[in-house]
């Protein structure tokens, strides 16, 4: 039953894509202080809005969010992102300021929020962020024509069902891998700074164009 529900949800988002029911995509990515959506915090948010043909609309967002004093980031997160807590405090928005930007400027009506593994990771951080700041944690992803879409699942489906025309990477043991930075490398897509949120967003848009 769960697999049927999952398939139905993915089919709904696919229909929205090909029919143009929604007006814009907003591709986004997060860099966080750790892996727990409940206990860790967003340190960097980047995103770019496009039309339904993946043409950019307006300027991209690339925002730092100040870590609060009682959040201790994991050393692994700092090594991967290169973002220090001090940098977020010096240059970043407070969570209250950041969540207002998300609510009023980014996740606007008729926006499809798109990411890579976002349904299982990034979206959960956004939900906890809204909850902590007294906003509804779900409306940003369903109300007034809003929805969300995970390109990792599309990549997996494409690799399994229609792999032609795309170079598919394997890991050091020869096993299939769908890591974004390896897909971009295999297909000659510019991705100079993996794990920088804006670089990941631009790479994700290019991979989406490749699949399309």
Question: What does each of the following model-derived ranges do?
Answer:
Residues 1-2, 24, 117, 195:
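A subset of signal/propeptide-processing and intrinsically disordered low-complexity segments
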Residues 13-55:
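Entry/capping segment at the start of metal-dependent catalytic domains
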Residues 15-17, 102-104, 137:
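Short, flexible, glycine/charge-rich loop motifs used to bind or transfer phosphoryl groups or to couple energy/partner
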Residues 33-35, 88, 194:
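Short strand->helix junction
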Residues 40-45, 49-83, 105-212:
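Metal-dependent phosphoesterase core characteristic of DEDDh/y 3'-5' exonuclease domains
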Residues 81-98:
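Metal-dependent phosphoesterase signature
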